[in-house]
Structure formats: C-alpha cells, structure tokens
Amino acid sequence: DHAARLLRNGGYHQTTLREIAEAVGIRKASLYYHFASKEEIVEAVVNDGVRFVHEGVFAALAATVGEAPRARLEAAIRGHLAALHGHGDYTTASIKVFNFGAAPAPESVRAVRRAYEEVWSRLIAELQQAGALPAARAPEVLRNFLLGALNGSTDWYRPDRHDIATLAQEFTELVSPAGT
C-alpha cells in the first residue's frame, strides 16, 4: 500500500527505495528480502492496479450476460470507473508508471494489459455487430480512446461532484449514442 501511494504521488523516477522502506518502517536493505529490485516492486503495484480494474469490469460484465451490448458497455465503464477510483493508489500508480522509465514494461505487465484490452476489444465487436456502433469505426482506436478517457479521470474525478453511475452513462452516450 505504501509503495502504491508513493508511486501514485511521485511516479517512477521520483519514488526511491529509501522512501518506500521508510514508509513501511524498515531499512532499505530489508526491502531486498521481499523484492529483488525497485522494478519488481513497481511491477507488483502495476499488476495489482490493472487486476483490480480487470476484476471490476469482469464482475460488471458477468452481471449483464445476455443484456444488450450497450448495457454491457455501460456496466463495463461503470465497473472500470468504480475500481479505478475505489483502489486509487494502485490503479493510479499503474497508469502513472506503466512505462518503467527508459526500460520497457516487463512481460507480465504487458500480458496483463493485453488481456484487459482484449476484453474491451470483444465488447466493441459486440457493439458493432449489434449496430450500436458504426462498423467503419476502428475498434483499436475506439478502445484506446475510451480507456484513455476513463483512466484520465484520475486527474479530474471528484466523488462530491460526479456520481460513478451517472458518469458511466455519460461516457456510454459519448461512445454509443442512444438510437445508433
């Protein structure tokens, strides 16, 4: 939890192992008993952040099996936003430090992200097949746009100003206007 909070606030380059150790209440050298490197700590935080969101979306989609694709889209958006803002330190840190500085993200991080993107690609394909999205739209561009917009809400979302369910409806309307 401490590493996620520090990474959320400082990012990869500004967060040091010394800060993480101090936040946990141990010596820096003791961190190496649990993790081989800073990159391994970051990898764990990023994977947990993506997993929290992935689980939220899976639960939302499981609850809407058999419903119209547009309803499933709204549920997935709501699940993503609820998990994103419900596990803020992990999820925001995972967005902020996905690219580990100059080094490419580890394969485990890329694999988790690809699996999550595939969920959205399938959902977009459902929407296109149902006529809720124009078939001419490039699914990958739409997926990246939508995930970027949802993840970008970490910069401006305030629970006292926006309700997650209402926000999910608004995002859904932007992506797939009613009547399309």
Which residues does each predicted region cover?
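Conserved hydrophobic residue
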Residues: Y12-H13, L133, H162
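Short, structured helix-loop boundary elements
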Residues: L17, E39, E43, N47, ...
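Amphipathic alpha-helical packing segments from all-alpha helical-bundle domains
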Residues: D48-F58, G86, P104-A130, P139-N144
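Helix-turn-helix
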Residues: H2-E40, A44
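Hydrophobic alpha-helical connector segments
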Residues: A44, F58-G88, L142-L146
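Solvent-exposed, amphipathic alpha-helical segments
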Residues: H2-N9, F52, G56-A63, A149-W156
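Amphipathic alpha-helical segments used for helix-helix packing
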Residues: L84-P104, S121, D155
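Amphipathic C-terminal alpha-helical segment
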Residues: A82-G86, R122, E126, A136, ...
